[in-house]
Amino acid sequence: MMPMNPKQLKKLMKQLDMKQLDGVKEVIIKLENKEIVIKEPVVTVIRAMGEKMYQIAGGTEEERVVLKISEEDIKLVMEQAGVDYETAKKALEEAGGDLAEAILRLTDQ
């Protein structure tokens, strides 16, 4: 591909109805069991056939596992350890969702 000067690039972007979003700090793509976090990306919005498409490029990528903790699990930890909702939830998160580990951590304090 031949290099383009900035003026030609702006003209082409206008013809394709492309606009760059400024000030984007991060983009999070949420999957069923994890999140992909792209920090400091370059995000371009493209309009074609009545649809908006977002192109995300560059940046630092990290994956985070999303832990799903059920209300039943939180209530069980609350009852067994004699703690409030937030304490039980935090203990479950720290224990990676392991009920026994969360209860042991709370009762061994």
Curated annotation (Swiss-Prot):
One of its GO terms (biological process) is protein transport. Contacts the emerging nascent chain on the ribosome. Keywords: Protein transport, RNA-binding, Transport. Belongs to the NAC-alpha family. Pfam families: NAC, UBA_HYPK. InterPro entries: NAC-like_UBA, NAC_A/B_dom_sf, NAC_arc, Nas_poly-pep-assoc_cplx_dom, UBA-like_sf. It comes from Pyrococcus abyssi (strain GE5 / Orsay). Homodimer. Interacts with the ribosome. Binds ribosomal RNA. Residues 3-69 form the NAC-A/B domain. SMART domains: NAC. Gene3D superfamilies: DNA helicase RuvA subunit, C-terminal domain, Nascent polypeptide-associated complex domain. This is Nascent polypeptide-associated complex protein. GO terms for molecular function: RNA binding. It comes from the Archaea.
